[in-house]
Amino acid sequence: DSGSISGIDIKSISCMFQENRLIPDLSAIDNVRIVLRGKPNRQEIRNNLLSILPDDSLDMPVNSLSGGMKRRVALARALSYPGKLIILDEPFTGLDKNTKLNVIDYILKMRNNRTLLIATHGTDDANLLGAEIIKLDKNIN
């Protein structure tokens, strides 16, 4: 099924929520595979995930992974979806500095000329990823 919001096909939008919204009993690979159309290549997904997750975590149920690992699975799922717009809500929550830099490289690699909308409190993160940055510095009611 498809629908549109102001003429934009909602199937062209991918989102990573602040809460990971993963399927707990599925592996990292299967959580990514489930959003892909057609017959996704399991080995390609594995190779893709290896750039941000250790090999021994890829086939484990995501409910057994750490918070930072779950975050990276959610990110991989959002970036793997073939949408034109990718919305990432606080993608760096729970990540240490080195992991965050690795994830930033991953985002840039997986971007594929698509539009990213990233909500973050980290000005440095926004500067590394953003071509255009909009800063909200007051509460909006």
Language model regions located:
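Catalytic "switch" loops of ABC-type ATPases
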Residues: 12-13, 18-23, 122
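Helix N-cap at the start of a conserved alpha-helix in ABC-type nucleotide-binding domains
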Residues: 97-99
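Catalytic Walker B motif of ABC-type/P-loop ATPase nucleotide-binding domains
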Residues: 86-90
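Conserved ABC ATPase signature
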Residues: 61-65, 69
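Q-loop/switch helix immediately C-terminal to the Walker
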Residues: 26-38
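Conserved signature/switch motifs of ABC ATPase nucleotide-binding domains
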Residues: 81
